[in-house]
């Protein structure tokens, strides 16, 4: 009888004085999402993250939006990262590495990931405006910093060029989605091994 892979799902509920967030993910999904953070542009970006990674995501966040969007965006990144870490477990059998150059109209963004258990973010993205609509562009980095830290991944994101700030932000989310999709896929040639000569990813 063939080995049956355990379900790669993760659920996190996180509550502080600033936010209350619940996240569930299915790494082996089809990119179905149900997202409500109260921040419209952020919801749009998270929908892209789910759709293009094929990771099913259900996210509900209530935050102190009367202050600003910062706590909601950062804490959502923390919760998604924690849920992904739970879903991936010991990361046995995964492809581990991936990179992509992703185009959207006039914009090109590069992302590379090592699902290594070692959190690190290299961020080389510059926005020409402090806001996209009412959304602070600096929060794009804050989200990915929180995601990388709590998912235990090494993530590099570089905007190569682009004139439209919405496109720059969107290609960051889409490119990260695509590398997560590839790097977390099960490689049948790994035969269930942890993809490291150390025998562990940490």
Swiss-Prot record:
One of its GO terms (biological process) is L-histidine biosynthetic process. This is Imidazoleglycerol-phosphate dehydratase. Its EC number is 4.2.1.19. Keywords: Amino-acid biosynthesis, Cytoplasm, Histidine biosynthesis, Lyase. It is found in: Cytoplasm. InterPro entries: IGPD_sf, ImidazoleglycerolP_deHydtase, ImidazoleglycerP_deHydtase_CS, Ribosomal_Su5_D2-typ_SF. Pathway: Amino-acid biosynthesis; L-histidine biosynthesis; L-histidine from 5-phospho-alpha-D-ribose 1-diphosphate: step 6/9. It comes from the Bacteria. Belongs to the imidazoleglycerol-phosphate dehydratase family. GO terms for molecular function: imidazoleglycerol-phosphate dehydratase activity. Pfam families: IGPD. HAMAP family: HisB (MF_00076). GO terms for cellular component: cytoplasm. It catalyses: D-erythro-1-(imidazol-4-yl)glycerol 3-phosphate = 3-(imidazol-4-yl)-2-oxopropyl phosphate + H2O. The keyword Transport does not apply.
């Amino acid at each position: 009888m063939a080995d049956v892979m355990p379900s790669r799902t993760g659920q996190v509920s996180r509550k502080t004085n600033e936010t209350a967030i619940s996240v569930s993910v299915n790494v082996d999904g089809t990119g179905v999402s149900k997202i409500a953070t109260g921040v419209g542009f952020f919801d749009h970006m998270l929908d892209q993250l789910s759709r293009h990674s094929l990771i099913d995501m259900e996210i509900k966040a209530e935050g102190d939006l009367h202050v600003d969007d910062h706590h909601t965006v950062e804490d959502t990144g923390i919760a998604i990262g924690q849920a992904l870490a739970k879903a991936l477990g010991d990361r046995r059998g995964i492809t581990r590495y991936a990179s992509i150059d992703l185009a959207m109209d006039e914009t090109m963004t590069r992302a590379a990931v090592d699902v290594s258990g070692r959190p690190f973010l290299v961020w080389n993205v510059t926005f020409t405006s402090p806001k996209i609509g009412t959304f602070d562009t600096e929060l794009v980095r804050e989200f990915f910093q929180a995601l990388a830290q709590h998912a235990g991944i090494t993530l590099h994101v570089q905007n190569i060029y682009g004139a439209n700030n919405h496109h720059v932000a969107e290609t960051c989310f889409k490119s990260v989605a695509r590398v997560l999709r590839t790097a977390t896929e099960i490689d049948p040639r790994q035969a269930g091994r942890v993809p490291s000569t150390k025998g562990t990813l940490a």
